[in-house]
């Protein structure tokens, strides 16, 4: 059986990478900080596909949400889209760059599967994201105590996410976290913890990749 290989950008705690490895996949992890088991430490904008030692079967991308978040986008953007801070300009450049890398991998491997993940916010409004199919998942539907509605763009038609939840749902056990509260995602200290992805979601995504890979062989 062919080994399935993937890349994980903005990896942080490697939620996706760990799930993939538990299913026997090979993973190349990228982050700008030297967290544990990061293979490439550096600015994604300075990368090219030759920095990855193989042509991947899949890629997961979790770019910085700071300038796209509902809470802070007015600090960084005009009309929620046009960048007005240097960091917003930088984030747009980085995201366009890794999307260009996705396009290169698709040329080399037409079966390349990608996922782009960001908390529900203004990234969905950006012009460079409009060509991708978007789903919205809620972390509480994957065993997390946070609701955290999250957008995921992908070309994998075999992945069917779980039904969405809603704020104040009496039938869900997620923490109630009005804006500014100390519960839910807002109560997690540091971006490292806030960015962790539920293992049930990671495994579901990776299993859909295995299914797609087997179907295409």
Feature-to-residue mapping (PLM):
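Conserved active-site and SAM-binding loop architecture
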Residues: 1-217
């Amino acid at each position: 059986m062919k080994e399935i290989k993937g890349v994980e950008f903005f990896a942080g705690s490697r939620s996706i990478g760990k799930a993939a490895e538990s299913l026997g996949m090979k993973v190349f992890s990228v982050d700008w900080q030297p967290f544990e088991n990061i293979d490439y430490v550096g600015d994604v904008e300075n990368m090219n596909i030759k920095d990855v030692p193989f042509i991947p079967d899949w890629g997961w991308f979790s770019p910085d949400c700071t300038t796209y978040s509902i809470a802070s986008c007015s600090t960084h953007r005009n009309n929620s889209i046009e960048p007005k801070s240097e960091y917003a300009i930088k984030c747009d450049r980085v995201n366009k760059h890794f999307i260009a890398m996705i396009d290169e991998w698709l040329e080399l491997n037409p079966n390349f599967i990608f996922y782009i993940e960001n908390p529900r916010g203004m990234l969905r409004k950006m012009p460079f994201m409009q060509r991708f199919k978007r789903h919205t998942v809620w972390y509480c539907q994957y065993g997390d105590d946070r609701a955290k509605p999250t957008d995921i763009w992908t070309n994998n038609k075999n992945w069917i996410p779980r039904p969405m939840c809603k704020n104040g749902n009496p039938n869900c056990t997620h923490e109630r976290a009005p804006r500014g509260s100390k519960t839910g995602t807002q109560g997690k200290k540091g971006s490292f913890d806030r960015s962790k992805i539920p293992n049930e979601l990671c495994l579901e995504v990776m299993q859909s990749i295995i299914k797609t890979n087997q179907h295409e062989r």
